[in-house]
Amino acid sequence: MPNDTDVRILDAVCSFEPVSFRAPLKFGGRIVDKTFLMNVEVTVETHSGNHATGFGSMPVGNIWAWPTSELTGDKTELAMKDFAERIVNIASQVPHYGHPMELMFDLTEEYAHTAKTIVAGHNFDGEFPKLAQLVAASPLDAAVHDAYGRVHDINSYDALSSDFMNDDLSDYLDDQFAGEYLDQYTLRTPKERMPLYHLVGALDPLTDADVVDRPNDRLPVTLGEWINADGLTHLKIKLSGDNFD
């Protein structure tokens, strides 16, 4: 059932911001030293004519969202950027009002066709992975939720209850979730402290003996230096998978 708090998308714009890494990262057998941020701005309008603009951003992430030995990283990166632009353009043409959950859920119907069009246009072998589609669309999703929260002057996570959502989770999942809403699965107040996970790539130097080139920026380089500097307690370790000794 429609809600007075529903919004429609007035405008959606996608841009790409190049980012160079301080040090190369080895992930999934590939070495990357740069990427792009997919930045999306979305302006929404309420039934009463109020406007707000939200923002969402996500690294392209093709190195993990589209693991393949058939295509180069440059090609999968280009395809994901293409997908992001197309989906954002489609979103800007959606005429109806709704809650961000249903607006974005309806948009997912365009994902498969858009992905097939891109694969054919770039003359790729194989399919455009669903994970890569979701990652490429994620900054749009974040921007729509952000704009919705801003136009109602609330935390967007607090807009996931029956007071704002038009449908319960059974519409998106199955009957087991009848009568349930996303606010039941999210916190109402932010945690004061959360552990920071430090990513350790397969090329990251563990000791001074592993350092090939030390940047002249006074920041830590070895894992031990990072632990001492930031008081790390949680590590996310990426293995190269080619050394079992």
Give the location of each predicted region.
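N-terminal amphipathic alpha-helix/helix-capping segment at the start of soluble metabolic enzymes
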Residues: 2-13, 162-163, 171-194
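Conserved, mostly hydrophobic/aromatic
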Residues: 40, 49, 140-142, 153, ...
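A generic structural motif
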Residues: 46, 62, 241-243
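N-terminal glycine-rich anion-binding loops that anchor highly charged ligand groups
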Residues: 37-60
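Metal-dependent enolase-superfamily TIM-barrel catalytic cores that perform enediolate-based chemistry
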Residues: 175-245
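Metal- or metallocofactor-binding catalytic centers and their adjacent structured scaffolds
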Residues: 52-158, 162-163
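Glycine- and acidic
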Residues: 25, 125-129, 234-239
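Short, Gly/Pro- and small/polar-rich lid/capping loops
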Residues: 1-43
